[in-house]
From Swiss-Prot:
It comes from the Bacteria. Belongs to the MnmG family. TrmFO subfamily. Keywords: Cytoplasm, FAD, Flavoprotein, Methyltransferase, NAD, NADP, Transferase, tRNA processing. This is Methylenetetrahydrofolate--tRNA-(uracil-5-)-methyltransferase TrmFO. It holds the Pfam family GIDA. One of its GO terms (cellular component) is cytosol. It is an enzyme of class 2 (transferase).
Protein backbone atom coordinates (compact mmCIF):
# COMPACT_ATOMS: atom_id res chain seq x y z
CA UNK A 1 0.00 0.00 0.00
CA UNK A 2 1.39 3.41 -0.99
CA UNK A 3 1.73 6.29 1.42
CA UNK A 4 -1.22 8.68 1.57
CA UNK A 5 -0.83 11.99 -0.27
CA UNK A 6 -3.39 13.81 1.90
CA UNK A 7 -2.39 17.17 3.35
CA UNK A 8 -3.49 16.29 6.91
CA UNK A 9 -3.50 13.44 9.43
CA UNK A 10 -6.61 12.03 11.11
CA UNK A 11 -6.67 11.31 14.84
CA UNK A 12 -9.72 9.39 16.07
CA UNK A 13 -10.42 9.80 19.76
CA UNK A 14 -9.42 12.66 22.06
CA UNK A 15 -8.57 10.76 25.22
CA UNK A 16 -5.08 10.89 26.68
CA UNK A 17 -3.48 9.03 23.77
CA UNK A 18 -5.38 10.82 21.01
CA UNK A 19 -4.84 14.25 22.55
CA UNK A 20 -1.11 13.60 22.85
CA UNK A 21 -0.90 12.23 19.31
CA UNK A 22 -2.77 15.22 17.85
CA UNK A 23 -0.48 17.68 19.62
CA UNK A 24 2.72 15.90 18.59
CA UNK A 25 1.59 15.95 14.94
CA UNK A 26 0.46 19.59 14.96
CA UNK A 27 3.63 20.85 16.68
CA UNK A 28 5.52 19.47 13.69
CA UNK A 29 3.56 21.74 11.37
CA UNK A 30 1.08 19.18 10.04
CA UNK A 31 -2.71 19.84 9.95
CA UNK A 32 -4.77 17.46 12.09
CA UNK A 33 -8.42 16.43 11.94
CA UNK A 34 -9.21 15.38 15.52
CA UNK A 35 -12.43 13.36 15.86
CA UNK A 36 -14.21 12.94 19.21
CA UNK A 37 -17.71 11.50 19.51
CA UNK A 38 -18.40 12.83 23.01
CA UNK A 39 -20.64 15.82 22.55
CA UNK A 40 -22.61 13.86 19.95
CA UNK A 41 -22.70 10.43 21.59
CA UNK A 42 -22.02 9.82 25.27
CA UNK A 43 -20.10 6.90 26.76
CA UNK A 44 -21.00 5.02 29.96
CA UNK A 45 -17.78 5.99 31.71
CA UNK A 46 -17.15 9.64 30.79
CA UNK A 47 -18.72 12.50 32.73
CA UNK A 48 -17.81 15.43 30.43
CA UNK A 49 -17.00 16.24 26.82
CA UNK A 50 -13.49 17.43 27.73
CA UNK A 51 -10.47 15.89 26.05
CA UNK A 52 -8.11 13.59 27.99
CA UNK A 53 -10.69 13.14 30.75
CA UNK A 54 -9.53 11.04 33.70
CA UNK A 55 -12.33 8.54 34.23
CA UNK A 56 -11.26 6.89 37.49
CA UNK A 57 -8.38 8.20 39.60
CA UNK A 58 -6.91 11.69 39.29
CA UNK A 59 -3.41 10.33 39.91
CA UNK A 60 -0.56 9.96 37.46
CA UNK A 61 1.12 7.82 40.13
CA UNK A 62 4.64 8.07 41.54
CA UNK A 63 6.88 10.96 40.57
CA UNK A 64 10.28 9.74 41.75
CA UNK A 65 12.86 8.59 39.20
CA UNK A 66 13.23 5.42 41.28
CA UNK A 67 9.69 4.61 40.14
CA UNK A 68 9.32 3.47 36.51
CA UNK A 69 6.26 5.64 35.87
CA UNK A 70 8.13 8.59 37.35
CA UNK A 71 10.92 7.98 34.85
CA UNK A 72 8.40 7.73 32.01
CA UNK A 73 6.86 11.06 33.00
CA UNK A 74 10.27 12.77 33.04
CA UNK A 75 11.03 11.37 29.59
CA UNK A 76 7.68 12.67 28.35
CA UNK A 77 8.40 16.12 29.78
CA UNK A 78 11.63 16.18 27.79
CA UNK A 79 9.63 15.22 24.71
CA UNK A 80 7.21 18.15 25.23
CA UNK A 81 4.14 16.13 26.24
CA UNK A 82 0.91 18.16 26.30
CA UNK A 83 -0.48 15.78 28.93
CA UNK A 84 2.49 16.23 31.25
CA UNK A 85 2.62 20.00 30.77
CA UNK A 86 -1.06 20.54 31.54
CA UNK A 87 -0.88 18.02 34.35
CA UNK A 88 1.91 20.03 35.99
CA UNK A 89 -0.08 23.24 35.56
CA UNK A 90 -3.06 21.69 37.38
CA UNK A 91 -1.18 19.70 40.00
CA UNK A 92 -2.64 19.09 43.47
CA UNK A 93 -0.81 17.88 46.62
CA UNK A 94 -0.36 14.12 46.66
CA UNK A 95 2.83 13.36 48.55
CA UNK A 96 5.31 11.57 46.32
CA UNK A 97 2.76 11.08 43.57
CA UNK A 98 1.60 13.36 40.78
CA UNK A 99 -2.12 14.09 41.04
CA UNK A 100 -4.10 16.73 39.18
CA UNK A 101 -7.24 18.80 39.44
CA UNK A 102 -9.27 16.53 37.22
CA UNK A 103 -11.54 19.19 35.71
CA UNK A 104 -8.98 21.97 35.41
CA UNK A 105 -6.47 19.67 33.75
CA UNK A 106 -8.93 18.30 31.17
CA UNK A 107 -10.27 21.76 30.38
CA UNK A 108 -6.77 23.10 29.78
CA UNK A 109 -5.87 20.22 27.44
CA UNK A 110 -9.14 20.76 25.56
CA UNK A 111 -8.59 24.51 25.24
CA UNK A 112 -5.03 24.10 23.97
CA UNK A 113 -6.06 21.63 21.27
CA UNK A 114 -9.25 23.46 20.25
CA UNK A 115 -7.31 26.71 19.90
CA UNK A 116 -4.39 25.24 17.98
CA UNK A 117 -4.35 26.74 14.47
CA UNK A 118 -3.47 23.40 12.83
CA UNK A 119 -6.04 21.25 14.66
CA UNK A 120 -9.61 20.96 13.41
CA UNK A 121 -11.85 19.40 16.07
CA UNK A 122 -14.75 17.38 14.66
CA UNK A 123 -17.39 16.17 17.13
CA UNK A 124 -18.65 13.05 15.41
CA UNK A 125 -18.65 9.26 15.80
CA UNK A 126 -16.40 7.41 13.38
CA UNK A 127 -17.70 3.98 12.37
CA UNK A 128 -15.36 3.33 9.44
CA UNK A 129 -11.57 3.36 9.35
CA UNK A 130 -10.64 6.37 7.20
CA UNK A 131 -8.63 5.65 4.07
CA UNK A 132 -8.21 9.28 3.01
CA UNK A 133 -5.08 10.02 5.04
CA UNK A 134 -2.56 8.74 7.57
CA UNK A 135 -4.68 7.97 10.64
CA UNK A 136 -4.07 7.42 14.34
CA UNK A 137 -6.84 5.43 16.06
CA UNK A 138 -6.97 6.08 19.81
CA UNK A 139 -10.54 5.21 20.72
CA UNK A 140 -9.88 3.76 24.14
CA UNK A 141 -10.58 0.51 25.98
CA UNK A 142 -14.31 0.60 25.24
CA UNK A 143 -14.17 1.19 21.49
CA UNK A 144 -17.65 1.37 19.95
CA UNK A 145 -18.96 -1.87 18.48
CA UNK A 146 -19.15 -0.48 14.94
CA UNK A 147 -15.52 0.61 14.82
CA UNK A 148 -14.37 -2.47 16.72
CA UNK A 149 -15.86 -4.64 13.97
CA UNK A 150 -13.91 -2.71 11.32
CA UNK A 151 -10.66 -3.09 13.26
CA UNK A 152 -11.44 -6.78 13.67
CA UNK A 153 -11.93 -7.11 9.89
CA UNK A 154 -8.81 -5.09 9.10
CA UNK A 155 -6.79 -7.56 11.10
CA UNK A 156 -8.12 -10.52 9.16
CA UNK A 157 -10.89 -11.29 11.61
CA UNK A 158 -8.39 -11.80 14.39
CA UNK A 159 -6.44 -9.92 17.00
CA UNK A 160 -9.03 -7.61 18.57
CA UNK A 161 -10.71 -9.15 21.55
CA UNK A 162 -12.37 -8.47 24.82
CA UNK A 163 -10.04 -8.42 27.78
CA UNK A 164 -11.78 -9.63 30.87
CA UNK A 165 -8.96 -10.57 33.20
CA UNK A 166 -5.30 -10.21 33.98
CA UNK A 167 -3.28 -12.13 36.53
CA UNK A 168 -0.66 -10.49 38.75
CA UNK A 169 2.90 -10.18 37.43
CA UNK A 170 5.94 -10.63 39.68
CA UNK A 171 9.57 -9.52 39.53
CA UNK A 172 11.49 -12.80 39.19
CA UNK A 173 14.41 -11.52 41.25
CA UNK A 174 12.14 -11.39 44.32
CA UNK A 175 11.03 -15.05 44.11
CA UNK A 176 12.61 -17.43 46.65
CA UNK A 177 13.97 -19.96 44.16
CA UNK A 178 14.82 -22.42 46.94
CA UNK A 179 11.11 -23.13 47.41
CA UNK A 180 10.08 -23.57 43.76
CA UNK A 181 11.10 -25.89 40.93
CA UNK A 182 11.19 -25.64 37.14
CA UNK A 183 8.96 -28.10 35.31
CA UNK A 184 6.24 -28.36 32.66
CA UNK A 185 3.21 -30.55 33.29
CA UNK A 186 3.91 -34.19 32.39
CA UNK A 187 7.38 -32.98 31.29
CA UNK A 188 5.93 -31.97 27.93
CA UNK A 189 8.36 -29.80 25.99
CA UNK A 190 11.02 -27.82 27.77
CA UNK A 191 10.64 -27.02 31.46
CA UNK A 192 8.91 -23.67 31.24
CA UNK A 193 7.08 -23.04 34.52
CA UNK A 194 8.21 -22.19 38.01
CA UNK A 195 6.11 -24.38 40.30
CA UNK A 196 5.20 -23.36 43.84
CA UNK A 197 4.12 -26.54 45.67
CA UNK A 198 1.72 -26.56 48.62
CA UNK A 199 1.06 -29.12 51.31
CA UNK A 200 -2.56 -29.76 52.29
CA UNK A 201 -2.15 -27.56 55.36
CA UNK A 202 -0.73 -24.71 53.28
CA UNK A 203 -3.50 -25.04 50.72
CA UNK A 204 -6.27 -25.00 53.34
CA UNK A 205 -4.86 -21.82 54.90
CA UNK A 206 -4.50 -20.23 51.46
CA UNK A 207 -8.07 -21.19 50.48
CA UNK A 208 -9.43 -19.70 53.69
CA UNK A 209 -7.54 -16.43 53.18
CA UNK A 210 -8.59 -16.19 49.53
CA UNK A 211 -12.30 -16.76 50.15
CA UNK A 212 -12.35 -14.15 52.90
CA UNK A 213 -10.28 -11.50 51.11
CA UNK A 214 -11.86 -8.15 50.24
CA UNK A 215 -12.74 -7.51 46.60
CA UNK A 216 -12.32 -4.17 44.85
CA UNK A 217 -15.51 -2.21 44.13
CA UNK A 218 -16.74 -2.23 40.55
CA UNK A 219 -17.36 0.85 38.45
CA UNK A 220 -20.98 1.20 37.37
CA UNK A 221 -20.08 0.71 33.73
CA UNK A 222 -18.26 -2.56 34.52
CA UNK A 223 -20.93 -4.34 36.53
CA UNK A 224 -22.98 -5.94 33.78
CA UNK A 225 -19.80 -7.13 32.06
CA UNK A 226 -18.08 -8.56 35.10
CA UNK A 227 -18.90 -12.22 34.57
CA UNK A 228 -18.60 -12.26 30.79
CA UNK A 229 -14.94 -13.23 30.91
CA UNK A 230 -12.65 -15.49 32.84
CA UNK A 231 -13.62 -16.49 36.35
CA UNK A 232 -11.73 -14.66 39.13
CA UNK A 233 -9.67 -16.99 41.31
CA UNK A 234 -11.57 -15.85 44.43
CA UNK A 235 -14.91 -16.74 42.81
CA UNK A 236 -13.54 -20.15 41.84
CA UNK A 237 -12.38 -20.70 45.43
CA UNK A 238 -15.84 -19.92 46.79
CA UNK A 239 -17.44 -22.56 44.58
CA UNK A 240 -15.85 -25.34 46.56
CA UNK A 241 -12.76 -26.23 48.50
CA UNK A 242 -11.43 -28.47 45.71
CA UNK A 243 -12.49 -26.40 42.70
CA UNK A 244 -9.04 -24.81 42.28
CA UNK A 245 -7.42 -28.25 42.55
CA UNK A 246 -9.09 -29.16 39.26
CA UNK A 247 -8.22 -25.79 37.76
CA UNK A 248 -5.17 -23.52 38.02
CA UNK A 249 -3.80 -25.27 41.13
CA UNK A 250 -4.02 -28.79 39.69
CA UNK A 251 -0.95 -30.78 40.86
CA UNK A 252 -1.22 -33.71 38.42
CA UNK A 253 1.90 -34.12 36.29
CA UNK A 254 3.96 -31.78 38.45
CA UNK A 255 5.82 -34.24 40.67
CA UNK A 256 8.52 -33.03 43.04
CA UNK A 257 12.03 -33.16 41.58
CA UNK A 258 14.40 -35.68 43.14
CA UNK A 259 16.41 -32.96 44.87
CA UNK A 260 13.38 -31.24 46.44
CA UNK A 261 13.93 -30.72 50.19
CA UNK A 262 10.97 -28.50 51.09
CA UNK A 263 7.88 -29.48 53.10
CA UNK A 264 5.63 -32.21 51.72
CA UNK A 265 2.79 -34.45 52.86
CA UNK A 266 4.47 -37.69 53.92
CA UNK A 267 6.08 -39.60 51.07
CA UNK A 268 3.77 -38.33 48.35
CA UNK A 269 5.64 -37.66 45.11
CA UNK A 270 3.15 -35.00 43.99
CA UNK A 271 2.23 -31.84 45.94
CA UNK A 272 -1.30 -31.40 47.25
CA UNK A 273 -1.61 -28.23 45.14
CA UNK A 274 0.66 -26.24 42.82
CA UNK A 275 0.67 -22.60 41.77
CA UNK A 276 2.45 -22.13 38.46
CA UNK A 277 4.40 -19.05 37.38
CA UNK A 278 4.89 -18.39 33.68
CA UNK A 279 7.56 -16.20 32.11
CA UNK A 280 5.98 -12.96 30.96
CA UNK A 281 8.70 -11.18 28.99
CA UNK A 282 11.50 -12.16 26.66
CA UNK A 283 14.18 -11.18 29.16
CA UNK A 284 12.72 -13.60 31.73
CA UNK A 285 12.65 -10.95 34.44
CA UNK A 286 8.86 -11.05 34.90
CA UNK A 287 6.55 -13.95 35.72
CA UNK A 288 2.76 -14.07 35.95
CA UNK A 289 0.67 -16.27 38.25
CA UNK A 290 -1.08 -18.63 35.86
CA UNK A 291 -4.88 -18.62 36.10
CA UNK A 292 -4.96 -16.10 38.94
CA UNK A 293 -7.05 -13.39 37.33
CA UNK A 294 -8.61 -11.53 40.21
CA UNK A 295 -10.60 -8.54 41.38
CA UNK A 296 -9.27 -8.45 44.93
CA UNK A 297 -8.07 -5.14 46.32
CA UNK A 298 -4.37 -4.70 45.67
CA UNK A 299 -3.41 -4.85 49.33
CA UNK A 300 -5.35 -8.09 49.66
CA UNK A 301 -3.62 -9.55 46.61
CA UNK A 302 -0.25 -8.85 48.20
CA UNK A 303 -1.33 -10.33 51.54
CA UNK A 304 -2.95 -13.48 50.15
CA UNK A 305 -0.64 -14.26 47.23
CA UNK A 306 2.46 -13.86 49.40
CA UNK A 307 1.19 -16.96 51.23
CA UNK A 308 2.22 -18.95 48.15
CA UNK A 309 5.52 -20.77 48.86
CA UNK A 310 8.37 -18.86 47.23
CA UNK A 311 6.41 -15.62 46.98
CA UNK A 312 6.69 -14.53 50.61
CA UNK A 313 8.72 -11.46 49.59
CA UNK A 314 7.59 -11.18 45.98
CA UNK A 315 7.30 -7.72 44.44
CA UNK A 316 4.27 -7.24 42.21
CA UNK A 317 4.99 -5.13 39.12
CA UNK A 318 1.31 -5.36 38.22
CA UNK A 319 -1.63 -6.49 40.30
CA UNK A 320 -4.46 -8.52 38.80
CA UNK A 321 -7.53 -6.74 37.47
CA UNK A 322 -10.99 -7.70 36.22
CA UNK A 323 -12.87 -5.55 33.74
CA UNK A 324 -13.93 -5.56 30.13
CA UNK A 325 -11.57 -3.96 27.70
CA UNK A 326 -10.80 -4.10 24.03
CA UNK A 327 -7.20 -4.58 23.11
CA UNK A 328 -5.24 -5.72 20.11
CA UNK A 329 -2.89 -8.61 19.55
CA UNK A 330 -0.14 -6.00 19.29
CA UNK A 331 2.77 -8.47 19.06
CA UNK A 332 1.37 -9.72 15.76
CA UNK A 333 -0.34 -6.59 14.48
CA UNK A 334 1.82 -3.57 15.36
CA UNK A 335 5.39 -2.41 14.89
CA UNK A 336 7.39 -0.79 17.68
CA UNK A 337 6.09 2.63 16.57
CA UNK A 338 2.44 1.44 16.94
CA UNK A 339 2.14 1.33 13.15
CA UNK A 340 -0.13 -1.34 11.67
CA UNK A 341 1.72 -4.15 9.94
CA UNK A 342 -1.27 -4.60 7.62
CA UNK A 343 -1.72 -0.94 6.69
CA UNK A 344 1.32 1.36 7.02
CA UNK A 345 -0.91 4.47 6.86
CA UNK A 346 -2.59 3.40 10.11
CA UNK A 347 -1.35 3.83 13.68
CA UNK A 348 -2.98 2.83 16.96
CA UNK A 349 -2.48 4.34 20.41
CA UNK A 350 -3.76 4.07 23.96
CA UNK A 351 -5.09 1.17 25.98
CA UNK A 352 -6.32 -0.65 22.89
CA UNK A 353 -2.66 -1.40 22.08
CA UNK A 354 -2.10 -3.17 25.38
CA UNK A 355 -0.56 -0.40 27.46
CA UNK A 356 -2.21 0.05 30.84
CA UNK A 357 -2.58 3.33 32.71
CA UNK A 358 -3.05 7.04 32.10
CA UNK A 359 0.63 7.87 31.65
CA UNK A 360 1.31 4.82 29.51
CA UNK A 361 -1.64 5.66 27.25
CA UNK A 362 -0.40 9.21 26.76
CA UNK A 363 3.11 7.88 26.08
CA UNK A 364 1.81 5.58 23.36
CA UNK A 365 0.04 8.56 21.80
CA UNK A 366 3.32 10.47 21.86
CA UNK A 367 5.13 7.63 20.07
CA UNK A 368 2.34 7.04 17.54
CA UNK A 369 1.80 10.75 16.84
CA UNK A 370 5.52 11.41 16.44
CA UNK A 371 5.87 8.56 13.97
CA UNK A 372 2.71 9.40 12.05
CA UNK A 373 4.21 12.86 11.54
CA UNK A 374 7.54 11.39 10.47
CA UNK A 375 5.77 9.11 7.98
CA UNK A 376 3.88 12.13 6.63
CA UNK A 377 7.21 13.91 6.10
CA UNK A 378 8.77 10.74 4.66
CA UNK A 379 11.29 10.60 7.48
CA UNK A 380 12.71 7.47 9.08
CA UNK A 381 10.68 6.00 11.94
CA UNK A 382 11.79 7.00 15.45
CA UNK A 383 12.23 4.01 17.76
CA UNK A 384 13.27 5.11 21.23
CA UNK A 385 16.05 3.10 22.95
CA UNK A 386 15.03 0.04 24.97
CA UNK A 387 17.06 1.52 27.82
CA UNK A 388 14.33 4.18 28.21
CA UNK A 389 10.85 3.75 29.65
CA UNK A 390 9.23 5.24 26.53
CA UNK A 391 11.21 2.81 24.38
CA UNK A 392 10.77 -0.31 26.49
CA UNK A 393 6.98 -0.06 26.77
CA UNK A 394 6.26 -0.12 22.99
CA UNK A 395 8.90 -2.84 22.65
CA UNK A 396 7.18 -4.96 25.30
CA UNK A 397 3.66 -4.73 23.86
CA UNK A 398 4.87 -5.46 20.32
CA UNK A 399 7.29 -8.26 21.21
CA UNK A 400 5.53 -10.13 24.02
CA UNK A 401 4.38 -13.73 23.64
CA UNK A 402 1.21 -13.32 21.58
CA UNK A 403 -0.46 -16.40 23.07
CA UNK A 404 -0.27 -14.99 26.58
CA UNK A 405 -0.23 -11.26 25.85
CA UNK A 406 -1.96 -9.05 28.43
CA UNK A 407 -1.92 -5.28 28.98
CA UNK A 408 1.04 -3.91 30.91
CA UNK A 409 2.02 -0.92 33.03
CA UNK A 410 5.50 0.50 32.68
CA UNK A 411 7.94 -1.08 35.16
CA UNK A 412 11.68 -1.55 35.54
CA UNK A 413 11.34 -5.23 34.64
CA UNK A 414 10.71 -4.41 30.97
CA UNK A 415 13.58 -1.91 30.65
CA UNK A 416 16.87 -3.30 29.32
CA UNK A 417 19.08 -4.44 32.18
CA UNK A 418 22.18 -2.53 33.20
CA UNK A 419 25.49 -3.86 31.97
CA UNK A 420 28.04 -5.10 34.46
CA UNK A 421 27.58 -6.59 37.94
CA UNK A 422 24.06 -6.38 39.36
CA UNK A 423 23.60 -3.49 41.82
CA UNK A 424 22.15 -5.16 44.92
CA UNK A 425 20.57 -2.07 46.47
CA UNK A 426 17.25 -1.64 44.67
CA UNK A 427 17.08 2.14 45.04
CA UNK A 428 20.61 2.55 43.69
CA UNK A 429 19.85 0.14 40.83
CA UNK A 430 16.74 2.06 39.82
CA UNK A 431 18.62 5.37 40.05
CA UNK A 432 21.27 3.97 37.71
CA UNK A 433 18.62 2.75 35.25
CA UNK A 434 16.94 6.16 35.29
CA UNK A 435 20.22 8.03 34.85
CA UNK A 436 21.13 5.87 31.85
CA UNK A 437 17.62 6.24 30.39
CA UNK A 438 17.65 10.03 30.46
CA UNK A 439 21.19 10.19 29.06
CA UNK A 440 20.26 7.81 26.24
CA UNK A 441 17.08 9.76 25.50
CA UNK A 442 19.03 13.02 25.30
CA UNK A 443 21.54 11.37 22.95
CA UNK A 444 18.69 10.04 20.80
CA UNK A 445 17.07 13.48 20.53
CA UNK A 446 20.39 15.18 19.79
CA UNK A 447 20.89 12.87 16.81
CA UNK A 448 17.63 13.89 15.11
Amino acid sequence: MSQSTATYINVIGAGLAGSEAAYQIAKRGIPVKLYEMRGVKATPQHKTTNFAELVCSNSFRGDSLTNAVGLLKEEMRRLDSIIMRNGEANRVPAGGAMAVDREGYAKSVTAELENHPLIEVIRDEITEIPDDAITVIATGPLTSDALAEKIHALNGGDGFYFYDAAAPIIDKSTIDMSKVYLKSRYDKGEAAYLNCPMTKEEFMAFHDALTNAEEAPLNAFEKEKYFEGCMPIEVMAKRGIKTMLYGPMKPVGLEYPDDYTGPRDGEFKTPYAVVQLRQDNAAGSLYNIVGFQTHLKWGEQKRVFQMIPGLENAEFVRYGVMHRNSYMDSPNLLTETFQSRNNPNLFFAGQMTGVEGYVESAASGLVAGTNAARLFKREEALVFPQTTAIGSLPHYVTHADSKHFQPMNVNFGIIKELEGPRIRDKKERYEAIASRALADLDTCLASL
